[in-house]
Amino acid sequence: MKRFRRHGHESQRDKHKQDLYQFNKTVEHGFPHQPSALGFSPSLELLAIGTRSGAIKLYGAPGVEFMGLHDENAAVTQVHFLPNQVELVTLLEDNSLHMWTLRAHNSMCELLEIGRFTLSGPPGAIPSVTRVTAVLAHSSGELLLLGTEGGHVFVVEVPGFRELEENNISVEDVQNRVPEDYVGRRNLESVETLHENPLNPRQVLIGYSRGLMVLWDLDRQRPVQHFLGTQQLESVWWMEDGESILSSHSDGSYCQWTVTGEDPQTEPEKQETPYGAFPCKAISKIIQLPSKQGPPFLIFSGGMPRASYGDRHCISVIHSKTHEALDFTSRIIDFFVIREGENHKGEPSALVVLVEEELVVVDLQTEGWPVIQTPYLVPLHCSAITCSHHVSSIPLKLWERVQAAGAHQNTHYSRKPWPINGGKNLAPDPPQRDLLLTGHEDGTVRFWDASGVCLYPMYKLSTAGVFHTDADPNDNMNQGSEGEWPPFRKVGCFDPYSDDPRLGIQKIHLCKYSGYLTVAGTAGQILVLELNDEAAEQMVEATVVDLLQGQEGFRWKGQARLDVREEPVLFPPGFQPFALVQCQPPAVVTAIALHSEWKLVGFGTSHGFGLYDYNQRNNIMVKCTLNPSDQMAMEGPLSRVKSIKKSLRQSFRRIRRSRVSMRKHHTNNAAKLQEINARLEAEALQEMELAPVQRKIEARSSDDSFTGLVRTLYFADTFVSDSSHSTPSLWAGTNGGAVFAYVLRVPPQERRAEDPVTAHAAKEIQLMHRAPVVGLVVLDGKGAPLPEPLEVAHDLARSPEMHGSHHLLVVSEEQFKLFTLPKVSSKSKLKLTAVDGSRVRRVGVAWFGSRTDEQLESCLVVLTNQGELHVISLPSIKMLVHYPCIRREDVSGIASCVFTKYGQGFYLISPSEFERFSLSTRWVVQPHCLVEPPLQMRSKSPSSPVHRDLPDGVPTEHRNFKGDSEGYENSARQVMEHALLNDESVLQEIQKSLEGDQTTFLENNLKTKPKAGNVLSNGD
């Protein structure tokens, strides 16, 4: 009977876990890393971005997002939406074409891959014959025209990827009709561009890289007109009236040609080099659009004078007498223009530019062409991210004040709404307001609305104004000088350069109830700031704190501290600094804690920790934790708190320098060289903090490097001296496994401004295994974590239980240990692992609840260096669930992880993107959206210039997708039946392929089974 009862108990416990815990990666925030292709559907109003890693991401109205991932690890080079369809085609670097669709399922859409195709060409053909360089999605929605490196144009029927061989355009067909005296006749080179006649879909313009352009009639299979260009062709634009063509070239010129039907046209009607007469770079893309406000808009990328501005990334916009060269800080990938009106044929309204590090949208209808603020795809890495901090359940008053401060900073943006509005966001409104704060290398802190799917920028705080830096305050990088030519104008916010790396933010702590903020930096600076709704000119009071306490024999060899401005500084509305603590030596601040009820800030570095009273502006205590053997702590910024990229770069630079110096000195001692390189590579691996080899928990010697480094600080009102009186206290954990406790005497509120705060050492714990202490939590008499400062005062948490025994939970890298207070006797412990070398990298307290029960449970959430997430019960410290989350090789992702109060988390998957995940069944933020097919699809009459019946068994619904998921599934099923050889014509095609006539038909039809990408969706 016992066994049966135990089994029932286990089942009940498993069900309880299922009700509370569920791991999901929900959405990616930020800007896609290494974008490589851009597409836009005017009918769907959806934007598509392909990346070098093979991802494809679709964006519409805020909250409408889709993501897919190609199986092939190849860059996406082109993205094309089928006109008036819900399908799109991607071309990869490996020359494969992929068909994707948005399919409705359970009242939401998913992005699915439904087919793939690779041109095979005739037997024995060289690869260039089928290497695709240009793609045209025909307006019929039924054809793809594929131009290749060898000059051929293949016609393929979609969505089944059936090659229509009789409609292909060979390079020989084109060459035979070119005048014999044309200089480029013998070698047309690759097809650079394909464009459909806007007035006659049966005519296509083929542009070859040597300069020849051919107007081809698809019905009659012959050329209509030749345009004999002599400069290398970059792009072509067909005017809306169908009577003129613009071509841009590699010498920085563009030409206008007239479509007359008279063959050939040897000279352009107009030729111009906008930034001549000296040699210019290529104009890679050109667009001209009519405007009711006067002359047309002429927009082109590139064309800059090669010698003077060849390194600039520019798009020029010319309209009437206005001419601007929009200057970006990263390479331009592609651009397009959004137009107003029915069928998007009206006035140009916005220029959308994808550059390597951001997406910029320019308002073309407002004077000055201001930038429209993006609600998503914001570059998180405008300056490199150095730390993150999440705050849940922000009070409405604080939220509105931060919003108002941000509005003061956004006056330079256009007031026009976001122009990309495809799809419907069906996700419910967020249940709470959440903030994500990111610290950056340039000394800024950015506030993001992290409540929903879109990570929206709210406010930016800059700390650089407090200090004297190398930047010239009169240096205005945003505007060109009067009369400058070309007329440059800086656009975008990506700025990879920092005025002074010492400004970098390392730690952030925000009190959501009081509006106080503490930020700490790379050069030992800790700023205390208060939210102010008005601009204010004030001094920042600086206090220098000597963490070495006058110890002799130590000499700081690292960076100098930042110079504080001694004059009053004008601070805009928002968070304004009023107090500064400067640590000496000016090492990286490794830990901070803020208690806004007591008005205290704790701070720690590799040398010790201190306590600062920001109410009375004085330092209360200092504790030096430096071990006499910690000589490395005097060398400068610590490798463990550097960016991973910097650590890797510096480590391998040392390796290279070592090898170079050895060669220079002609050292022939191979054994010595091998030993040195092995040591340096070992140092590099140590700095990378890779997963260690399998080992058991073992005691560490006290002479391990940086044992005095302070890893965590914690304020608690608990029993430290005796069990009858609780007192305020400060706890500190170090890299050497030591925990220090200080009892604080905080005067009552009415005497707080006059009486001093005092601190006295009370306890010291030394863990036997000396593993770094990464977290400290005090549990009340009921085993619950103590509430945040001011949380009880605002009636947002119950008062802690002070009658039972309190416990201190010490989280080291290798184990969790519970001590009773005030005796500090060990009660229980949990080893993270004994064999596989797992170490705790991130720890936080989170509250979990089921979807049906309002009751919440507190747990410990842990991320290890193996990339695994663990949920641990409190106060019993038992392992509840664990999930793999991050690859253990992704050191920067693990180091960047931040937990939320309700079981969610964020970590960097690239310098510009956060992955959001959830461990909770109750709190999940993910896209839930629907895209309806365009109206044209529902009453579409085929306008394809080439019509070929599909084989029996392939229904027309597959060609003209109606948006009905059931119909789509039936269609897909019938396509698969067709692929499974139920059709006579298929067998004939196979017979041909066996004879060598065609090799791709079967392969491509067998691949039409729908396959989901990495779908981000919320079906419940």
Swiss-Prot record:
SUPFAM superfamilies according to UniProt? WD40 repeat-like
- What Pfam family does this protein match (any one)? LLGL
In which ranges do the WD repeats occur? 36-69, 76-117, 132-169, 193-227, 233-264, 282-324, 332-364, 386-462, 506-581, 590-651, 710-766, 775-827, 832-884, 898-921
Q: Which GO terms describe its molecular function?
A: GTPase activator activity; myosin II binding
Keyword hit for Membrane: no
Q: InterPro entries per the record?
A: Lethal2_giant, LLGL2, WD40/YVTN_repeat-like_dom_sf, WD40_repeat_dom_sf, WD40_rpt
Which PANTHER family does the record associate with it?
LETHAL 2 GIANT LARVAE PROTEIN, LLGL SCRIBBLE CELL POLARITY COMPLEX COMPONENT 2
Write the protein's name.
Answer: LLGL scribble cell polarity complex component 2
Please name the source species.
Answer: Danio rerio (Zebrafish)
